[in-house]
């Protein structure tokens, strides 16, 4: 039920989220994390990119504008509709993680698979990562940007577990925040390795205003 609440929250807040992203209301993204994930993908020099959990499509669009062939997929039809309506050289499809876990994407493989703040669950994420090697072209890279555990932990104990979500700092247009599964840095690395992936790089984009990590980016390859 907890994983279902994540999808329900994103369906409820699809329009509000799209507005916040396109109006550049999320300061940490403007100052640090948007540019960081674009650079992380571009540095791999991919021809083809899969944006898993693409949301309203900003990253897929940004990468397509740089000449990459991009497919964005998301479980929320309203977000894919927003991505399509914005106009882009990227392609978009509705697909949830369960579908991808079960059957991949019809045998399609990509030079880069990227998940940008899109891995909030527990078992679903572990199962999805186990599928990633099947989605990568030879020498392909899997890139994840997520909340930095040391910063996101706050005053709670530094151990894996479900946390209640919050829309603190967002507009009143948001409601029903989604729960999310907190992982330590060690747990992220262990999960990547357990999925048949080899961590080749870790980046910690720093917010220039707070001078603290705004996120962590993992770059991995199939073993």
Q: What is the predicted function of each stretch?
A:
Residues 179-199:
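Short alpha-helix
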Residues 102-113:
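A short acidic, Gly/Pro-enriched loop at the edge of an enzyme's catalytic core
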């Amino acid at each position: 039920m907890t994983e279902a609440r994540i999808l329900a929250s994103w369906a409820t807040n699809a329009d509000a989220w799209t507005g916040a992203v396109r109006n550049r209301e999320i300061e940490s993204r403007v100052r640090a994390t948007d540019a960081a994930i674009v650079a992380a993908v571009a540095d791999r020099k991919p021809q083809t990119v899969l944006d898993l959990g693409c949301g309203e499509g900003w990253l897929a669009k940004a990468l397509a504008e740089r000449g990459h062939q991009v497919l964005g997929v998301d479980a929320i039809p309203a977000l894919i509709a927003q991505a399509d309506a914005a106009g882009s050289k990227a392609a978009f499809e509705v697909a949830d993680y369960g579908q991808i876990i079960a059957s991949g994407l019809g045998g399609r493989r990509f030079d880069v698979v990227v998940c940008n703040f899109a891995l909030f669950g527990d078992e679903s994420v572990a199962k999805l990562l186990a599928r990633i090697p099947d989605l990568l072209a030879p020498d392909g890279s899997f890139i994840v940007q997520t909340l930095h555990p040391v910063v996101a932990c706050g005053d709670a104990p530094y151990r894996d577990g479900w946390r209640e979500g919050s829309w603190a700092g967002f507009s009143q247009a948001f409601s029903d925040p989604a729960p999310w599964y907190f992982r330590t840095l060690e747990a992220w690395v262990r999960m990547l390795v357990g999925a048949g992936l080899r961590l080749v790089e870790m980046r910690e984009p720093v917010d220039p205003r707070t001078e603290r990590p705004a996120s962590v980016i993992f770059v991995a390859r199939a073993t």
